[in-house]
């Protein structure tokens, strides 16, 4: 899929996380237990993680950040699709002077 610029579907997330061509894992399952497991496995394989499953960060964020640092990778968060976050983004954009055409 990487070579051809296409999409790869699999049910074996461990194989995907351990693949040598994967640099970053974006975890967005919405399942905090699975998300923590996915992040820890990614760190074990030297992969950075962008955590979209905010419940996992609320549950184990400091531990995940520590494990990422120990593995020499990055643990980062991403805004999800929660309405309050969208409102914050709209406020930020307007404050910066950007016209908001849809939200």
What are the language-model segments listed below?
Residues 10, 50-51, 76, 101:
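Structural detector of well-ordered beta-strand residues that form the stable sheet scaffold
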Residues 29, 33-45, 52-81, 86-92:
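Rossmann-fold NAD(P)-binding glycine/threonine-rich loop
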Residues 2-8, 71-73, 98:
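A short helix-to-beta-strand connector/capping loop
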């Amino acid at each position: 899929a990487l070579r051809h610029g296409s999409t790869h579907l699999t049910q074996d997330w461990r194989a995907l996380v351990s693949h040598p061509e994967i640099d970053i894992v974006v975890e967005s399952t919405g399942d905090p237990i699975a998300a923590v497991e996915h992040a820890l496995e990614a760190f074990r394989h030297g992969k950075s993680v962008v955590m979209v499953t905010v419940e996992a960060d609320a549950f184990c964020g400091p531990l995940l950040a520590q494990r990422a640092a120990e593995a020499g990778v990055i643990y980062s968060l991403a805004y999800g699709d929660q309405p309050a976050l969208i409102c914050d983004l709209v406020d930020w954009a307007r404050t910066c002077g950007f016209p908001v055409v849809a939200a």
